[in-house]
Amino acid sequence: MGASIDDYCLIHKKILHSEDLLKYILETSAYPREHEQLKGLREVTEKHEWSSALVPADEGLFLSMLLKLMNAKRTIEIGVYTGYSLLTTALALPEDGKITAIDVNKSFFEIGLPFIQKAGVEHKINFIESEALPVLDQMLQETKEEDLYDYAFVDADKSNYANYHERLVKLVRIGGAILYDNTLWYGSVAYPEYPGLHPEEEVARLSFRNLNTFLAADPRVEISQVSIGDGVTICRRLY
C-alpha cells in the first residue's frame, strides 16, 4: 500500500515553523472567531487520511474578511475537499450570494455537507463533480459580461494552476480577485532543488516555482503573495 500524502507532508506542513507562535495565533485569534460549524468540520477533517489538505483556521478568517471587504457575491471555488474554505466562503457571502464549487470527488464534499446544512448556507452552493477545466470552458461560453464573478479560490491539482488562471482571468471581473492556495509549498519553492521530497511533491514544487514567476510577470493582474497557511497568492484583475 502506498504512503498517503500525510506521510510526506507533515514534516513541512506549513510556512510558520514555530509551533509555539502558530499555536498562539490559532488559540488567540483564530479559534475564538471560528464559526461553530467550521469548528466541527475542522475537527472531523483533522481525523481524515488527507487532513494535510485542510485550509487552516487563520487562513479561513483571512479569506472571510477579504470576501466581506470586497462585497463579493458571485464566486468560484476549484478544489473543495471536505469544504472548509467553501463553508467559510458561504458564510461570508450575502444571503443571495452564489458559489460554483468544482471538485472531482463528491465523497469528500459530503463529509462537510452536514455542517454546511446546519449553517444554513447550502442554498448558496452549486457543487459540480468534475474536472475543473471543462467546466470552466463551459462557463466561459455561457457567462455574459454583466455576470462575471467577483472572486475565485483555487486549491486543487497544482500542475493545472496556470491553466486555471487563463480561464479565471476572463471569468472574474476587472477589480475582482483570484486566489491560489499553497503557492509557497511548505517553503520549498525558495530553493532551486529540494532533495528528499516525494515525487508528487516535487512536481507540485516545480509547478509553483513556475507559477510564481509567471504571475509576477502577468500584466493582467497585480499580485500579493501572503505567507499565511502554506502561502496564498492574491491576484487582482486589472484588465
Curated annotation (Swiss-Prot):
Similarity remark: Belongs to the class I-like SAM-binding methyltransferase superfamily. Cation-dependent O-methyltransferase family.
Catalysed reactions, semicolon-separated: norbelladine + S-adenosyl-L-methionine = 4'-O-methylnorbelladine + S-adenosyl-L-homocysteine + H(+)
Top-level taxon in the UniProt lineage: Eukaryota
GO biological process per UniProt: alkaloid metabolic process; methylation
Top-level taxonomy: Eukaryota, Viridiplantae, Streptophyta, Embryophyta, Tracheophyta
Entry cofactors: Mg(2+)
EC number: 2.1.1.336
Name under which the protein is recorded: Norbelladine 4'-O-methyltransferase 5
GO molecular function, one term: S-adenosylmethionine-dependent methyltransferase activity
Swiss-Prot/TrEMBL keywords: Alkaloid metabolism, Metal-binding, Methyltransferase, S-adenosyl-L-methionine, Transferase
Top-level enzyme category: transferase
